[in-house]
């Protein structure tokens, strides 16, 4: 009986410290995740400053690259949160250009163009399982395909958000005109290059440093 009691008494602190260690590890992982999201959001904000404007309007920047990378590295939620933070940084630093419309329309436009447009780009993470499987099988072709499709999803969903915002904007000034068609064409002129650049850069990063997309790297 004494032997059993000693064994039990010895196992209690062991279990306690193991549980404590596990809790600390989980907290550390959450902290690391939050730090990564903050870094990628800041990088996205900076990359949005780098690019070139199109003659008819709109800018071609590299803002989608960090969102796509964090979505592949950490998943959809991390990508969506990163997109939200990028939009928030643009708004609080005054890097948004609302249309001269009613307050309600401006709020909706800002919400769509500077929050939803970047948040939905985080859905590029839908291709993360396919990428991880290809990585485990050392199939570089399928890895590249997953990256490109992820970039396409991010770009297309952002494009749709800007199209919707454009319909609201142009609809206020062009009554009777085909504002849907105009918004579709206008936003495609800069979003197509945005997709091509994002897909190319992400694919290059994957070739040069595939472990960049591994959360334990």
Model segments located where?
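Non-cytosolic membrane-interface motifs at loop->transmembrane helix junctions
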Residues: 57-64, 102-111, 181-186
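Alpha-helical transmembrane segments and their cytosolic interface
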Residues: 4, 13, 20-38, 130, ...
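Alpha-helical transmembrane segments and their lipid-water interface positions
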Residues: 82, 86, 93-97, 116-124, ...
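Membrane-interfacial segments
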Residues: 51, 55, 93, 97, ...
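Residue-level signature of the transmembrane alpha-helical core
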Residues: 38-42, 65, 80, 84, ...
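Hydrophobic transmembrane alpha-helices
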Residues: 19-81
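Short helix-perturbing small/polar motifs within transmembrane alpha-helices
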Residues: 26-27, 31-46, 100-162, 166
């Amino acid at each position: 009986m004494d032997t059993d009691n000693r064994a039990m008494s010895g196992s209690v602190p062991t279990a306690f410290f193991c549980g404590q260690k596990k809790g600390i590890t989980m907290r550390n992982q959450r902290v690391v995740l939050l730090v990564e999201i903050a870094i990628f959001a800041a990088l996205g904000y900076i990359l949005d400053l780098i690019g070139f404007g199109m003659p008819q309007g709109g800018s071609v920047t590299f803002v989608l690259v960090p969102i796509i990378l964090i979505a592949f590295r950490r998943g959809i939620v991390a990508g969506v949160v990163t997109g939200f933070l990028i939009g928030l940084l643009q708004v609080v630093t005054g890097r948004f250009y609302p249309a001269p419309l009613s307050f309600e329309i401006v709020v909706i436009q800002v919400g769509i163009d500077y929050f939803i447009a970047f948040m939905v780009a985080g859905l590029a993470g839908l291709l993360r399982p396919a990428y991880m499987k290809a990585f485990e099988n050392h199939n570089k072709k399928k890895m590249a395909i997953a990256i490109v499709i992820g970039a396409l999803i991010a770009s297309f969903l952002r494009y749709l958000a800007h199209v919707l915002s454009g319909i609201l904007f142009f609809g206020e000034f062009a009554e009777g005109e085909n504002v849907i068609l105009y918004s579709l064409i206008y936003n495609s002129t800069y979003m197509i290059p945005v997709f091509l650049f994002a897909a190319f850069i992400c694919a290059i990063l994957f070739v040069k440093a595939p472990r960049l997309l591994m959360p334990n790297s």
